[in-house]
């Protein structure tokens, strides 16, 4: 869940079902919920993740969900759409599908944003199944995390960051 304002009983019920190992129940809840709220990217990603089959690849999306919900939702909508398209195209050929991990880096500078993002980046780097990261929302935060990703050989794509210094770091 993004924050208290976005508390969503059906989505939360699905999360509890996932945590309890009740994938079929979660799929039904999320499918029904998305009929009325098709633009909820978090629910869409959860549903997509539940239907992924082996082999699959995992990427993370790290956004300041707590401090910039609207911007984060827009990025997550794009990721959810790309995940849906990619996975659908892999149904018949057995190619690698895509799972998405969502991380909240809360890059609000008044809330030690770069420090939080560095902690998130460090945790993502420890998860060997994660091959890359989409994020972060601001150039300052992307610059603060780039060394962590480089040292751990993680691909990092920052679609909203505009710093030319990031471009200079690209191989």
Predicted regions and their residues:
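Extracytoplasmic
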Residues: 38, 54-56, 74, 95-97, ...
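Short, well-structured alpha-helical segments in soluble
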Residues: 111-131
């Amino acid at each position: 869940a993004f924050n208290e304002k976005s508390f969503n009983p059906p989505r939360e019920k699905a999360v509890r079902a996932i945590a309890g190992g009740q994938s079929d129940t979660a799929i039904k809840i999320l499918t029904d919920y998305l009929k009325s709220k098709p633009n909820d990217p978090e629910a869409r990603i959860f549903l997509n993740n539940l239907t992924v089959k082996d082999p699959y690849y995992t990427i993370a999306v790290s956004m300041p969900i707590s401090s910039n919900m609207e911007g984060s939702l827009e990025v997550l909508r794009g990721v959810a759409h790309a995940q849906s398209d990619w996975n659908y195209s892999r149904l018949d050929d057995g190619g690698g599908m895509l799972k998405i991990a969502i991380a909240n880096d809360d890059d609000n500078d008044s809330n030690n944003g770069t420090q939080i993002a560095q902690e998130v980046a460090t945790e993502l780097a420890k998860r060997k199944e994660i091959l890359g990261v989409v994020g972060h929302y601001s150039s300052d935060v992307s610059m603060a995390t780039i060394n962590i990703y480089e040292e751990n050989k993680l691909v990092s794509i920052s679609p909203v960051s505009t710093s030319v210094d990031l471009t200079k770091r690209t191989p």
